[in-house]
């Protein structure tokens, strides 16, 4: 039987220990052993070697990036909490106490001192938590895991200890239960959808609340005119997104710092001048009295109180730009004292002027009072800084939404669209044109339709609290599976924060008909899109996997119908599969009976880690006899890595291919020994079995699928011990350079997916209508990869799933 075998570096069936030892001693740099074994480690600010000077600098920079949203909340919290006015003067003490302890419990205790430590090699957010869990337990739906992936820098992590049966039990349940996998996936896309809703509502409520202050100087302005001014600012905000923030980003921290100084100073002034006894709100007993006095009305008011913690998730999501210590310092030393003083001062002011609750912030600015309206010298500076702070808060939320969506693309949850990186200095600064247009349009429509911050706040709170709850549930899994904390601590975490968030959510849901329905509509649309796309993406992958062409049939495939011509140049065929020859290739050969002199099957694969070092980017394998010059390449990226431009990508790939050929020759002297130990290749092993309990491979099946029973050494052998074609290595490298000079052609499949004839109505709607609509209207295909049209060849193919 003439077929190719690949020999596993350790523990492969049919490989003698001597061969394994030989392979392990040779430090190869091809993708299947050497590159995977290298540990270069990405630089990150979270390292223990970071000095205090760097940490303090990062703490200052973090003020402008992650605190704009939560820092501008004083613009609208009291007006949202008391939409019908203040019923009792002591209600202010109870609400202030609620605000203070909400700030302490959720942002400070939960996020700053617990959640930040669950980062994924420095990156935070809902998607990072899901990726972290997926490295400990095989919960991802697409069966493209390879043993080499676990050897990439930043990937390998300590497995759960065998002494801790609970962690092993949780891991087993997650891997064997389809319901558990679906639940975690559902939580992830729910969190992503709510962040997108947050990114739509943050600009609307922040800009509208800041602009509303102009009516203090121009009381003749109508609310319609205020809305139109806000719409103009929003239009400019979304229009300049494509330029990024590289040129002006350095001003964010100073502007937000000035904002915090202003609101802290104004709050301190109001506290001293109006009523210093408001400090008794630090006694939580006033919360109990507030609910006793107001009952259901007090419970409903929690929907306004929770707006004081908007933007909290940003501390975690933007952690990749800073480190834990920097965020802890900036929160506890800058943010919390500033906003706490602001809320305390506003409460002291409202105790004296409760009728001004609808516009507390601007009317509490110190100055000479004339008919209880402020005309002091601080008004215009505060108004201008408030506008700038609102824009920065919106910009930070938009940047976070773009970054999260770019991560969702790597999970296969959205159509492939082009992600534009707007900064060469700061990673993670991305721009997605289609998403920017839809979010900008939605934000403007919301501003025009709702008109007031109170109405928008009803919708805003649902996005905020739902994201909190998603993080709480994922964090509980992290504590059980990865941190392996004591069960008492885990239960305490889940009960305290889960109960707090459920109470807030129940309050916000009471305002469902008053605007609360909006984020649910956003979430339903986005989740339907992501779930449908991911479902078809997985089913399509399985279809291709079930119809792979065995490597042993490559020779007969290339020689059918009188033979296939080898034309000059390099052909790169893109495929989702990481093993086997995709069904697209036979169709290409039959339609166009020619194959390029150097032919490479390319798979772009996203690993559940933030970054993959450039030296570890490519995995190569020889496909068939060496003389045919047919290769497989898996290009691996982290979920925050940017795809290179085509020319740069091709240059890196060719360099890696030549290195692979160079070091393949190092195995020639050991070929006979390994051949004697190797079994005949069994193509059936390359076809992974479906697990009866889930749509993901079992661990054994993944091993077989990803490597054809073998992985680490990537030695390509002839079954009969026949040595590879004798060709001088340097000559072969020159041949590759020559073919590259003759042109590189990119080949892609234009797949049309349809539901099978026996499919249910729901499946037909999802596949034939929703998926098809998304594919035709949103997918950019080769444009997302920036492939030039004059170098592209598309091959049509139909899949019936």
Curated annotation (Swiss-Prot):
**What induces or represses this gene?**
By potassium starvation in roots of young seedlings.
Q: Which GO terms fall under biological process for this protein?
A: potassium ion transport
Q: Which UniProt keywords apply?
A: Cell membrane, Ion transport, Membrane, Potassium, Potassium transport, Transmembrane, Transmembrane helix, Transport
Its chief place of residence is membrane
> Which parts of the chain does the record assign to the membrane side Extracellular?
81-94, 203-219, 269-298, 350-375, 451-461, 509-511
Distribution of this protein across tissues and organs: Expressed almost exclusively in roots.
**Protein topology in the membrane:** Multi-pass membrane protein
Which compartments is it annotated to reside in?
Cell membrane
Query: What do the Gene Ontology cellular component annotations say?
Result: membrane; plasma membrane
Composition-biased stretches (Polar residues): 704-717
Where are the residues of the annotated region Disordered? 1-20, 679-728
Which ranges does the record list as Cytoplasmic topological domains?
Answer: 1-57, 116-181, 241-247, 320-328, 399-429, 483-487, 533-801
Q: Which GO terms describe its molecular function?
A: potassium ion transmembrane transporter activity
Instruction: Output the NCBIfam families linked to this UniProt entry.
Output: kup
Task: Quote the protein name from its UniProt record.
Answer: Potassium transporter 1
The encoding gene is HAK1
């Amino acid at each position: 039987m003439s077929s190719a075998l690949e020999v596993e570096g350790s523990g492969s069936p049919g490989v003698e220990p001597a061969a394994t030892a030989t392979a392990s001693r040779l430090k190869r740099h091809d993708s299947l052993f050497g590159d995977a074994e290298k540990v270069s480690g990405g630089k990150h600010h979270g390292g223990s070697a970071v000095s205090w000077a760097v940490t303090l600098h990062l703490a200052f920079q973090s003020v402008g990036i992650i605190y704009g949203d939560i820092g501008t909340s004083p613009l609208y919290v009291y007006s949202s909490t008391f939409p019908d006015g203040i019923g009792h003067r002591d209600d202010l003490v109870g609400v202030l106490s609620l605000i203070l302890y909400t700030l302490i419990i959720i942002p400070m205790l939960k996020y700053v001192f617990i959640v930040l430590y669950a980062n994924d090699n420095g990156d935070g957010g809902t998607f990072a938590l899901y990726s972290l869990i997926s490295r400990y337990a095989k919960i991802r739906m697409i069966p493209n895991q390879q043993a080499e992936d676990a050897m990439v820098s930043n990937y390998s992590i300590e497995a759960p200890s065998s002494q801790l049966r609970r962690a092993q039990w949780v891991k087993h349940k997650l891997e064997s239960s389809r319901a558990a996998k679906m639940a975690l996936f559902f939580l992830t896309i729910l969190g992503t959808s709510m962040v997108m809703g947050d990114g739509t509502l943050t600009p609307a409520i922040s800009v509208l609340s800041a602009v509303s202050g102009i009516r203090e100087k121009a009381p003749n302005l109508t609310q319609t005119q205020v809305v139109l001014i806000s719409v103009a600012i929003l239009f400019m905000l979304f229009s300049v997104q494509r330029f990024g923030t590289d040129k002006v980003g350095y001003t964010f921290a100073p502007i937000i710092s000035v904002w915090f100084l202003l609101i802290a100073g104004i709050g301190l002034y109001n506290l001293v001048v109006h009523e210093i006894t408001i400090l008794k709100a630090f006694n939580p007993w006033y919360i109990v009295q507030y609910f006793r006095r107001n009952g259901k009305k007090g419970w409903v008011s929690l929907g306004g109180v929770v707006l004081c913690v908007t933007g909290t998730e940003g501390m975690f999501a933007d952690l990749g730009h800073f480190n834990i210590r920097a965020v802890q310092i900036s929160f506890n030393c800058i943010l919390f004292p500033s906003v706490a003083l602001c809320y305390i001062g506003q409460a002291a002011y409202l105790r004296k002027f409760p009728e001004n609750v609808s516009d507390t912030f601007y009317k509490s600015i110190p100055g000479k009072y004339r008919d209880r309206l402020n005309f002091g010298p601080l008004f215009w500076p505060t108004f201008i800084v408030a506008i700038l702070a609102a824009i920065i808060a919106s910009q930070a939320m938009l940047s976070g939404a773009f970054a999260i969506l770019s991560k969702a693309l790597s999970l296969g949850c959205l159509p492939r669209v082009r992600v534009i990186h707007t900064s060469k200095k700061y990673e993670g600064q991305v721009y997605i044109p289609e998403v920017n247009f839809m979010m900008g349009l939605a934000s403007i429509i919301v501003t025009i339709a709702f008109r007031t911050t109170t109405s928008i706040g009803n919708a805003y709170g649902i996005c905020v609290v739902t994201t909190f709850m998603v993080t709480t549930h994922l964090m509980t899994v992290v504590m059980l599976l990865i941190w392996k904390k004591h069960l008492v601590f885990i239960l305490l975490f889940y009960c305290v924060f889960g109960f707090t968030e459920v109470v807030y959510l129940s309050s916000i849901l009471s305002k469902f008909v008053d605007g609360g329905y909006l984020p649910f509509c956003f979430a339903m649309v986005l989740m339907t899109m992501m779930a449908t796309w991911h479902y078809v993406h997985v089913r399509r992958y399985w279809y291709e996997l079930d119809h792979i062409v065995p490597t042993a049939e490559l020779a007969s495939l290339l020689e059918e119908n009188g033979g296939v011509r080898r034309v000059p140049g390099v052909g790169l065929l893109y495929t989702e599969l990481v093993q086997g020859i995709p069904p697209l290739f036979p169709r290409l050969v039959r339609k166009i009976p020619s194959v390029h002199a150097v032919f490479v099957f390319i798979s772009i694969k996203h690993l559940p880690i933030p970054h993959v070092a450039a030296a570890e980017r490519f995995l190569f394998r020889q496909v068939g006899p060496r003389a045919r010059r047919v290769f497989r390449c898996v290009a691996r990226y982290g979920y925050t890595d940017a795809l290179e431009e085509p020319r740069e990508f091709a240059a890196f790939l060719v360099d890696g291919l030549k290195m692979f050929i160079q070091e393949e020759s190092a195995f020639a002297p050991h070929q006979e020994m390994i051949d004697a130990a190797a079994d005949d290749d069994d193509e059936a092993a390359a076809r992974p079995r479906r697990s009866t309990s889930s749509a993901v491979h079992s661990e054994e099946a993944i091993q077989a699928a990803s490597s054809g029973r073998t992985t680490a050494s990537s030695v390509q052998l002839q079954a009969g011990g026949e040595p590879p074609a004798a060709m001088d290595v340097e000559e072969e490298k020159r041949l590759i350079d020559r073919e590259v000079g003759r042109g590189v052609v990119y080949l892609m499949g234009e797949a049309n997916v349809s539901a099978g004839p026996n499919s249910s109505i729901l499946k037909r709607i999802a596949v034939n209508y929703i998926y098809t609509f998304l594919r035709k209207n949103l997918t950019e295909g080769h444009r997302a990869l920036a492939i030039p049209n004059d170098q592209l060849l598309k091959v049509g193919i139909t899949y019936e799933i």
